[in-house]
Amino acid sequence: RDYYASRGLGDVYKRQAPRLNGARLPSDWEAQDYPPRAGREAHGPNWDTVADYRACLEAVRPATNLILFAGHNTLRKGVMGDAPRAATPDDIATMTRNLEQALDEGAWGMSTGLVYHPGVHSRPEEVLALATACARRGGFYATHMRSEGDHLLEAIDEVLALVRATGIRAQISHLKTSGRANWHKLPEALARIEAARAEGLRLHSDRYPYLSAGTDLDIVLPDWASAGGNAAILRNLEDPAARRRIIAALDA
């Protein structure tokens, strides 16, 4: 009871795009979350779309199977740049069209990183609209939720509401309880997911089996310090007053 059996797995979730330099990919690359469209991460020397990227992959002949996801942050950047604001109806309509193109060209679904910029500025209705379009085409939804710490349970509830509304198949990526003050929330987090599955929702989650974590350093900065992307971060780090505010927030 309360134990799970699984085949041996490597790291089945990779965000980085493989370098398309003619080499076979490393054997630990089991899955690939690659954004398809119009943002900095989406572009390369030979591709702008999922169709272009697939053609490049086929030329490289990778050694592993790859699954492509349309990244919400890249969809957002392609329409809104790094603007720290809510999306307008026109913004959402354009993102939806770009997502549908990516899905039609072979993306397996949509992924979100709602603790990262610019996704941190999105409202639930924006993500819901895109997930609805994804569900219509049979796509999958993989999410880095809005919180893995102080608001973990509320973030899980947002995912559950989205899955109930759309019927989409979903995965909570890297389920964790970040921060000692939140460690006690794990049983309740798992209970909510199990209850949703018993209800009939097609929802799963994964946890990596190690204690450390790795991500972009800007994740530890207060939202105001990183709003506007890397250029804004550098300006704030160079400004003595802003730097003192950042240090105070990190020490709090």
Predicted features and spans:
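Short acidic, glycine/serine/threonine-rich loops at helix termini
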Residues: R19-S27, K77-A83, S122-P124, L153-D157, ...
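Active-site glycine- and acidic-residue-rich loops that bind
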Residues: W47, A86-A93, H117-S122, G149-L153, ...
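Single conserved hydrophobic/aromatic residue that forms the stacking wall/gate
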Residues: R1-Y13
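Divalent-metal coordination cores built from histidine and acidic residues
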Residues: D11-W108, L201-L203
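Active-site beta-loop-alpha junctions enriched in small/polar residues
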Residues: G71-N73, G113-H117, R146-E148, L175-S178, ...
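Divalent metal-binding pocket/active-site signature
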Residues: Q101, A107-V159
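Hard-cation-handling environments
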Residues: L186-A252
